[in-house]
Structure formats: C-alpha cells, structure tokens
C-alpha cells in the first residue's frame, strides 16, 4: 500500500508529467526537463527508502514453520484420495447387495470423507489471525463431536433398523400425494 501511495505521489509531483500534459513548452525543452527529472530520480529512492522503511513489512521467501511442520502430510493426503476413490465402489456395492458390513463401510467412508472436507474448511477459514485463538479450537472440537455423533447415529440405524442402504431405498420409494392420484 505504501508503494502505491509513493508511486501515486511521484506521478502527481513529477514536473515532466505536468509539462507533458500542459504542452506549454516546446518539445526540445520537454526533453531537457525529462532528462533532469531522471537524473534526480536516481538519487531520490535512497531518501524515500529511509522514510518508507518503517512502514514496509518484511517479506520472507520461505514458508513459515508451523506447529505441524515436523510431520509429513503426504500419507494423510494419500489416505484421503484412497477413501474418495473407495466411495465410488462402496456406495454402489451397498445398494446392490445390502448388508451390515457394507452399510458400516459406507457409513465410515462417508463420515470420514465429510469430516476431512469440513475440517479443511475450518482450518482455511477459521484462522487464528482472522477470528482469534478460541473460535478455531471451538469449531474443530464441534466438528469432531458432530462427526462422532453422526457415525454413532448411522451405526445405531444400521444395527437396530433396516440398514443404511435399505433405509435410503425406502426413502426414495416414498410417493407423494400427487403420485397417488395419477
């Protein structure tokens, strides 16, 4: 921001730009003015740098070391991709041949896939620098509680009712009032 203010000020205060826009002097005088301004510009950045330096932030080329920087996330990324690809096989298999094992596998896969997706959003959008130190921790704990409760509820439904795939099939089979009249 300070650089843009500096550049705007340089454009406004530049005598050559004023002369160029007004065209009140002949072209030969204009070129002399431009040359004089360019000679002064070589010395000017040193003086400006001393004034602007306290306002400018330090820029680092390397990434900052975070608390989790000691571990590699490659394994987690690989597992996330395997679970995502596995969903392509587990969901149809659970509907083709419904069983408690496939229902449980589908419940675990869907809940963990959703948990990782929402966790990525919490980490990205609930940064401590934006919302403070407490809210990211509360959001992450709430996400864990919701994920565990969802998985527990799905297991309860699988064990004590018709199962997940059959329950979804029954839900799809519900006909509305308009369908009965036709």
Swiss-Prot record:
Pathway: Carbohydrate metabolism; tricarboxylic acid cycle. It is a multi-pass membrane protein. It is found in: Mitochondrion inner membrane. One of its GO terms (cellular component) is respiratory chain complex II (succinate dehydrogenase). The chain crosses the membrane at residues 72-96, 102-122, 136-157. One of its GO terms (biological process) is tricarboxylic acid cycle. A ubiquinone binds at residue 125. Residues 1-71, 123-135 are mitochondrial matrix. The keyword Cytoplasm does not apply. GO terms for molecular function: heme binding; metal ion binding; protein-membrane adaptor activity; ubiquinone binding. Heme binds at residue 113. It holds the Pfam family CybS. Residues 97-101, 158-182 are mitochondrial intermembrane. Forms part of complex II containing four subunits: a flavoprotein (FP), an iron-sulfur protein (IP) and a cytochrome b composed of a large and a small subunit. Belongs to the CybS family. This is Succinate dehydrogenase [ubiquinone] cytochrome b small subunit, mitochondrial. The gene is SdhD.
């Amino acid at each position: 921001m300070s650089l843009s203010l500096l550049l705007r000020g340089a454009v406004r205060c530049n005598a050559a730009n004023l002369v160029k826009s007004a065209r009140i002097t002949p072209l030969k005088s204009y070129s002399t003015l431009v040359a004089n301004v360019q000679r002064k510009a070589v010395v000017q950045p040193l003086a400006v740098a001393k004034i602007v330096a306290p306002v400018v932030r330090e820029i680092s080329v390397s990434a900052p070391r975070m608390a989790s920087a000691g571990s590699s996330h490659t394994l987690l990324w690989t597992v996330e991709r395997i679970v995502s690809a596995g969903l392509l096989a587990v969901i149809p298999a659970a509907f083709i041949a419904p069983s408690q094992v496939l229902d449980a596998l589908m419940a675990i896969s869907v809940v963990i896939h959703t948990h990782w997706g929402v966790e990525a959003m919490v980490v990205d959008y609930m940064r401590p620098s934006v919302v403070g130190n407490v809210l990211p921790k509360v959001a992450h704990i709430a996400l864990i509680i919701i994920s565990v409760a969802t998985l527990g509820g799905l297991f309860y439904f699988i064990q004590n009712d018709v199962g997940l795939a059959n329950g979804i099939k029954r839900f799809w089979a519900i006909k509305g009032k308009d369908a009965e009249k036709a």
